[in-house]
Amino acid sequence: MKLIVISGRSGSGKTIALHVLEDLGYNCIDGVPFQLLAQLIDTVDPKNNKVAISLDIRNLPTDASQIQTLLSSLQQKVEVEIIYLDAISAELIRRYSETRRLHPLSKNKLSLSQALELENELLEPIHKRAALSIDTTTLSIHNLNERLKIHLQGSTKSNLLIIFQSFGFKNIHPDDADYIFDVRFLPNPHWEPTLQKYTGKDQPVKAFLNGHLVVKQTINQIENLFHSWLPYLEENNRNYVTIAIGCTGGKHRSVYVAEQLAAQFKQKYQVQIEHKGLKDQL
């Protein structure tokens, strides 16, 4: 039997992750008391060979050694894989302000920021054992769904997942990027009145940028760079690499370049595109 454990700080997207696993055929159980986890595994019908549970601060012991001991004992019985979700504290606070929910640790007379900091410490024993950690700070529900499905379902392509991100320097910088390319030197469609309302995914902007040699050269140079580097990253057992492309507002140039690069690499690699300036967050 395979047991997937979804954990992470409150507001990081665990419920969404469980819904994805349910769609993939997992028997999902939310909020299992930690002390009953071993008993649950012993009583699960053997036919249910794929089980997923969520573990959060509400159902964990305060003694970290108990967490380590139980996880180790479970791994002797079944295949256990931990997926840990998190986001920067400022984003978690924003999500809480929208839902107006109380943090589970707020009953200890802690502020929300203090509760999140304590929660981070208490969950660290689980985080350290995670096979996959996902930062959901700027992920849409669709992107989180896609990231989990690629990880769990596998692919006939290379195991390396390439994440192309577009962003605007005047907005948010991608803290999770491995490589960042600044394309603000490229011709800017923003200064063309007829193009301002479009994005780098729309044909008028694509035609404008495709008509400039420097844009084509830039894309080719980035493409050639990673055609050379990616095999070495694979040899070092990298699971994914994040390549961020930034322009001023994250609407035109960076979106176009990210889309073009993704199209070039998707034949051989698993590819995901995240346009931080265009989409809603979790």
UniProtKB/Swiss-Prot annotation:
InterPro entries referenced in this protein's UniProt entry, alphabetically: P-loop_NTPase, RapZ-like, RapZ-like_N, RapZ_C
Keyword Transcription regulation: no
Residues engaged in binding ATP: 8-15
Keyword NAD: no
Keywords associated with the record: ATP-binding, GTP-binding, Nucleotide-binding
Family annotation (Gene3D superfamilies): P-loop containing nucleotide triphosphate hydrolases
Residue sites binding GTP per the record: 56-59
A GO molecular-function annotation: GTP binding
Pfam families noted in UniProt: PapZ_C, RapZ-like_N
Function: Displays ATPase and GTPase activities.
HAMAP family linked: RapZ_like
Family recorded in the similarity comment: Belongs to the RapZ-like family.
Protein name per the record: Nucleotide-binding protein Ping_2894
